[in-house]
Amino acid sequence: MSEQTFHGTTILCAKRNGEMVIGGDGQVTLGHVVMKGNARKVRRLFNGKILAGFAGATADAFTLFERFEGKLQTHNGQLMRAAVEMAKDWRTDRALRKLEAMMLVADADNMLLISGTGDVIEPAHDFISIGSGGSYAHSAAQALMENTDLSAKDVVEKALNIAADLCIYTNHNLTIESLNKED
């Protein structure tokens, strides 16, 4: 019997005109079966001031969100500091090292990708994506950012829907969270 693995998801973060947005789909797939269509893979952390989304094994997400929120508390909401400390732990902690996931995190000004290999990456553009449909969402977001005046929220929604049309591990049941610089 072959080992079945959890697949999927698409998470996209975009920033425009003082608005930071992270969105993700809700599909959880085990092997060739959709197990759940309405999972929440995007959350608000640290009293709503930080947005986070994950791609990877669903069970791992809860551990990652909890750990990252702890780092935010320890470092008083400093996104970069919390991300670097989280990545360090992820790389060195035996239990965390086995987690197969990636996270996008953002405050009102900055967005970061945190990987299980200990990388903390700040994107070159005002958008970044992860997950099985990440390249589709990234391409769509780039076209929308370069050729329209859509808000960050609209870019995220449209790009995720395009990814859902193309990626079998991504659906149209979206969760979208946003922060405004003025908040």
UniProtKB/Swiss-Prot annotation:
It comes from the Bacteria. Keywords: Allosteric enzyme, Cytoplasm, Hydrolase, Metal-binding, Protease, Sodium, Threonine protease. The keyword Isomerase does not apply. Its EC number is 3.4.25.2. It catalyses: ATP-dependent cleavage of peptide bonds with broad specificity. Na(+) binds at residues 164, 167, 170. It is found in: Cytoplasm. HAMAP family: HslV (MF_00248). A double ring-shaped homohexamer of HslV is capped on each side by a ring-shaped HslU homohexamer. The assembly of the HslU/HslV complex is dependent on binding of ATP. This is ATP-dependent protease subunit HslV. It comes from Hydrogenovibrio crunogenus (strain DSM 25203 / XCL-2). The gene is hslV.
